[in-house]
């Protein structure tokens, strides 16, 4: 029951009606029997500053930020975590002592989803497909302990991102980059961060051919609708282990949840709540 002591968290973006975040967060809240509620707010860019001020005034515990505000929100925050600053995007804000503090949990969400399948990720050869916003967070996190190659249809964009991450992480060996015609046979992990294959455009060619994939490779697609996008169907044909975007969605959400509440939510409860709605 909502009352004067209910703690508020939520999602800010445009649009937000497609989001599964309220479903999984409220499922975790119900499971833990804590007096929180998670709401989704459709917010235009010109209102971002007022929304941050309003969240402080109404004593929100925090909120998630989704497309298209992950970068623009940063100028209205009081503090930004060093990783989020380096990534150049924020997806989680905590309100504490009247201050709005920004974090980015997208990269750690992918890492945790992968480690659920592979164990600890160290010195793996990882191929990242795409160089957009999702790729930035994922590449930054995974490049800390692994050997990354970023590829994109526009090679210049892949080059720029790889050089930026190498510089920010002070990498002794710079990240590699290339085009979509890359030889994939030596990669342990391949991650698609592009929207190719997302509903409703599901009947498309995989973003890169996978016929030369390493026998024991792990292939991940950040898409979660459909649950098995064309990229993963193709990877499975060649014997790869596959992971869809549900894992990333849930784990990044779980890290956000813990930032706000100080409590680790049940990953299974969150995942089950989403799958039941797809």
Swiss-Prot record:
Gene3D superfamilies assigned: Leucine Dehydrogenase, chain A, domain 1 (3.40.50.10860), NAD(P)-binding Rossmann-like Domain (3.40.50.720)
HAMAP family: Shikimate_DH_AroE
Residue pairs linked by disulfide bridges in the UniProt entry: none
Kinase is among the record's keywords: no
SUPFAM superfamilies in UniProt: Aminoacid dehydrogenase-like, N-terminal domain (SSF53223), NAD(P)-binding Rossmann-fold domains (SSF51735)
Job of this protein: Involved in the biosynthesis of the chorismate, which leads to the biosynthesis of aromatic amino acids. Catalyzes the reversible NADPH linked reduction of 3-dehydroshikimate (DHSA) to yield shikimate (SA).
Reactions this protein catalyses: shikimate + NADP(+) = 3-dehydroshikimate + NADPH + H(+)
Recorded superkingdom: Archaea
Protein name stated in the entry: Shikimate dehydrogenase (NADP(+))
Location of the active site: 70 (proton acceptor)
InterPro entries linked to this entry: Aminoacid_DH-like_N_sf, NAD(P)-bd_dom_sf, SDH_C, Shikimate_DH, Shikimate_DH-bd_N, Shikimate_DH_fam, Shikm_DH/Glu-tRNA_Rdtase
Chain residues that bind NADP(+): 130-134, 222, 245
EC identifiers of the protein: 1.1.1.25
Keywords, in A-Z order: Amino-acid biosynthesis, Aromatic amino acid biosynthesis, NADP, Oxidoreductase
Record: residues binding shikimate: 19-21, 66, 91, 106, 224
Family named by the database record: Belongs to the shikimate dehydrogenase family.
Assembly mode: Homodimer.
Record-level GO BP terms: amino acid biosynthetic process; aromatic amino acid family biosynthetic process; chorismate biosynthetic process; shikimate metabolic process
Gene: aroE
GO molecular function ontology, one term from the record: NADP binding
Pathway terms, separated by semicolons: Metabolic intermediate biosynthesis; chorismate biosynthesis; chorismate from D-erythrose 4-phosphate and phosphoenolpyruvate: step 4/7
